[in-house]
Amino acid sequence: MNRLLQRQLFLENLLVGTNSMFHQISMRSINTCCRSLQRILDHLILLQTIHSPAFRLDRMRLRQMQMLACLWIHQHNHDLQATLGAIKWISP
């Protein structure tokens, strides 16, 4: 499998996994969602250090993912204090 195809497969799997977690939020608490998101981000950071450049996501893309996750949490949680707490917990 060539490098471009490997990268595409990796990104597709990441997207599917993230979408799957978000669609199950109605069955989970906001804290569980945050923990799952943190695991995904930790995994991405780990991949930054162990994979070739073809697999690396730049820091800007990681921040975009964090921001999208925070916006999603805000839309699905009407308690502003809880949302702000979740955003602080997710963001470095």
Swiss-Prot record:
Family to which the UniProt record says this protein belongs: Belongs to the rotavirus A NSP6 family.
The UniProt record lists the keyword Metal-binding: no
Quaternary structure note: Interacts with NSP2 and NSP5.
HAMAP family reported for this sequence: ROTA_NSP6
Keywords: Host cytoplasm, Host mitochondrion
Protein name according to UniProt: Non-structural protein 6
Species the sequence originates in: Rotavirus A (strain RVA/Human/Japan/KU/1995/G1P1A[8]) (RV-A)
InterPro entries with a match to the protein in the record: Rotavirus_NSP6 (IPR006950)
Cellular-component GO terms for this entry: host cell mitochondrion
Origin superkingdom: Viruses
Location in or out of the cell: Host cytoplasm; Host mitochondrion
